[in-house]
Regions:
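N-terminal glycine-rich phosphate/pyrophosphate-binding loop and immediately adjacent elements
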Residues: 1-110, 229
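Generic recognition of flexible, low-complexity loop/linker segments
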Residues: 4, 25-28, 196-198, 213-216
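Short, solvent-exposed loop/turn segments at the edges of secondary structure
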Residues: 87-90, 176, 222
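Conserved redox-cofactor binding core of oxidoreductases
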Residues: 112-214
């Protein structure tokens, strides 16, 4: 549904809160549809020097405002899982290893999926293909000692067929194999959302507003929403 939301003293058709994978895709699709778009991100734009500093110093890497830390890597420790977040323009894509696996065909035949009556493979395959193109997926051409260990472990467990090269959103011509994907790629090899979806959206007129945290949403009587945003 299309609404008008007041942001920063002006009206836009669409406000996207968060600039990670979901926010990046939403921003681009609405911009392609000709709508005016603002993307609100509580973190800042992360430059190469920020990533270099984060790779050397945890205080420059971690996001924990309550402790005075304003990096871009955040962890939430829950009861059964630890969640890693990226806080910056690009969201979680800043701090992931760019591994982009697709579900195997048999995943869609599991009872929980077939019960819906939807042809999930047919529905989702075109979107997986579009995302793979946009994120520049390539198969990792490199192997090393760790790969050999994994292959050996898979062999011992009787699942050797599950070991294979990994598809990743990385330009391997630019990759130096430093292994620092999770603290940000300083070499520009990782195709993070800020360099793909958001870049394309901005070229179409979308505005990305860093350091913008949404505190409150208010539905307007005449339609649309008012957002209270703080720096």
């Amino acid at each position: 549904m299309r609404h008008t939301a007041a942001v920063g003293g002006f009206d836009v058709d669409v406000v996207v809160v968060g600039s990670g994978f979901g926010g990046g895709v939403a921003a681009l699709r609405h911009a392609q549809a000709g709508r005016s778009v603002v993307v609100l991100e509580q973190g800042r734009r992360i430059a190469r020097e920020d990533m270099e500093a984060g790779g050397r110093n945890l205080r420059r890497l971690l996001w924990a405002p309550e402790a005075g830390l304003s990096g871009y890597f955040r962890q939430s420790v829950l009861r059964h899982v630890v969640v890693v977040h990226g806080v910056g323009v690009g969201g979680g894509s800043l701090v992931y290893a760019a591994v982009l696996l697709r579900p195997k065909p048999e995943a869609w035949t599991a009872p929980g999926w077939t019960a819906t009556g939807v042809d999930w493979a047919g529905e989702l395959d075109p979107h997986y293909a579009e995302a793979a193109t946009r994120l520049g997926v390539e198969t990792n051409p490199y192997t090393g000692a760790q790969d050999r260990w994994l292959a050996s472990a898979a062999e011992d467990l009787g699942v050797r067929q599950t070991f294979a090269p990994t598809p990743q959103g990385i330009s391997f011509d630019d990759c130096v194999r430093c292994g620092a994907c999770l603290s940000g790629c300083v070499h520009g090899a990782k195709n993070s959302v800020d360099r793909t979806y958001l870049d394309a959206a901005e070229r179409l007129g979308a505005v990305v507003a860093p350091r913008s945290k949404v505190r409150r949403l208010q539905r307007l009587r005449g339609g649309g929403w008012l957002l209270l945003v703080v720096d």
